[in-house]
């Protein structure tokens, strides 16, 4: 257990009418996009006050019916100028992130329903439900390479870029195995059977991958992804989303309990926790451009404060409390109390006229 259970309050939250299947936050601006079960993609903006660390409700920038069926996944480009999305219609599109206008699309290359999308130095790569991985040109969306047969034809749940090997390599996670794939040559290696479904993954550092498992654990992997090296038990329910934190070897992980844990995968310790919901699972995690944690279920999204944000909030609250206390105090200087003059006592050394 974490040493201390800290209660955090989200900066802002958003509820959705239709179930969401994907979120992505802009790498340089306070913006994000959401893809829904109806095929709609919506872009939002928000503003966090730099002095008080408060945030109002997100505002819609644009919304459009982007895919027939559902939008299965989406992601910003490296500089945030484009948004890539894939749908159950088998189409991948690149749109201008400011206007939402489509700049390129490919309607023919996906062999089955897409399940995930990742951006790398060289490609936009899409994992599919039949174990295929298709790499696209980032500008034209022309198909560049295709690898098939990962996970014995089972669904690709997550893709991780492995740029330390070369720009063509990815780790594919799905079913009960992890595969290293060169999109030019196909599957290079497959891990031992984990006897537990691998649902998600992230890179915790340049030399370590982390996977979320269906039995409530996160597992650590070396770069060869041959077998897990260590495991950390977080929950009695599945870990459906995991993302690297700002510091190496630290990750955020959440799932069926509706709780997100910050954990150090080297020490195996829980460092902090964020309660997204007591009723809904955590399906998606992201970080905004200032490394604020984002948690989302299929019907709600929350943006959480950083430690610096919480420090600013505490300072503002303390200053406000002092101001209110001062207002409640009586105005003006305190009145001085006048002493009553007592009758002087008879002085036996002086004669009274009546005695003369």
UniProtKB/Swiss-Prot annotation:
Please give the Gene3D superfamilies that the UniProt record associates with this protein.
YVTN repeat-like/Quinoprotein amine dehydrogenase
Ranges occupied by WD repeats: 15-54, 66-105, 107-146, 193-231, 234-275, 277-314
Q: Which InterPro entries match?
A: WD40/YVTN_repeat-like_dom_sf, WD40_repeat_dom_sf, WD40_rpt, WDR55, WDR55_POC1
Region annotation Disordered: where it falls in the sequence: 312-356
The cysteines joined by S-S bonds are none
GO terms under cellular component:
nucleolus
- Give compartment(s): Nucleus, Nucleolus
Q: What keywords tag this UniProt record?
A: Nucleus, Repeat, WD repeat
Know the name of this protein?
WD repeat-containing protein JIP5
- Organism whose genome encodes this protein: Yarrowia lipolytica (strain CLIB 122 / E 150) (Yeast)
């Amino acid at each position: 257990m974490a040493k201390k259970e800290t209660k955090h309050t989200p900066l802002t939250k958003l509820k959705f009418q239709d179930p969401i299947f994907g979120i992505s936050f802009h790498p340089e601006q306070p913006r994000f996009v959401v893809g829904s079960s109806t095929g709609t993609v919506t872009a939002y903006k928000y503003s966090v006050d730099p002095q008080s660390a408060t945030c109002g409700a997100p505002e819609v920038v644009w919304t459009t019916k982007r895919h027939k069926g559902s939008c299965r996944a989406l992601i910003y480009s490296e500089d945030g100028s484009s948004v890539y999305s894939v749908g159950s219609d088998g189409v991948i599109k690149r749109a201008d992130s400011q206007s939402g206008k489509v700049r390129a699309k490919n309607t023919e290359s996906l062999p089955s329903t897409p399940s995930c999308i990742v951006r790398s130095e060289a490609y936009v790569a899409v994992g599919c439900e039949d174990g295929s991985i298709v790499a696209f040109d980032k500008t034209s969306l022309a198909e560049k390479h295709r690898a098939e047969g990962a996970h014995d034809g089972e669904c690709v749940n997550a893709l991780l870029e492995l740029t330390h090997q070369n720009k063509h390599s990815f780790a594919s996670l799905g079913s009960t195995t992890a595969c290293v794939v060169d999109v030019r040559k196909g599957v290079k290696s497959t891990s031992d059977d984990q006897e537990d479904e691998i649902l998600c993954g992230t890179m915790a550092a340049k030399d370590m991958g982390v996977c979320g498992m269906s039995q409530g654990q996160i597992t650590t992997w070396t770069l060869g992804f041959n077998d897990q090296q260590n495991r950390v038990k977080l929950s009695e329910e599945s870990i459906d989303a995991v993302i690297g934190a700002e510091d190496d070897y630290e990750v955020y992980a959440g799932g069926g309990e509706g709780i997100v844990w910050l954990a150090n995968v080297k020490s195996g310790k829980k460092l902090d926790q964020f309660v997204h919901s007591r009723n809904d699972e955590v399906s998606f995690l992201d970080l905004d451009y200032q490394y604020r944690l984002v948690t989302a279920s299929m019907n709600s999204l929350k943006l959480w404060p950083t430690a610096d944000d919480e420090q600013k909030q505490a300072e503002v609250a303390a200053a406000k409390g002092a101001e209110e206390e001062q207002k409640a105090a009586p105005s003006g200087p305190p009145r001085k109390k006048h002493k009553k003059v007592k009758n002087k006592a008879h002085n036996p050394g002086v004669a009274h006229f009546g005695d003369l």
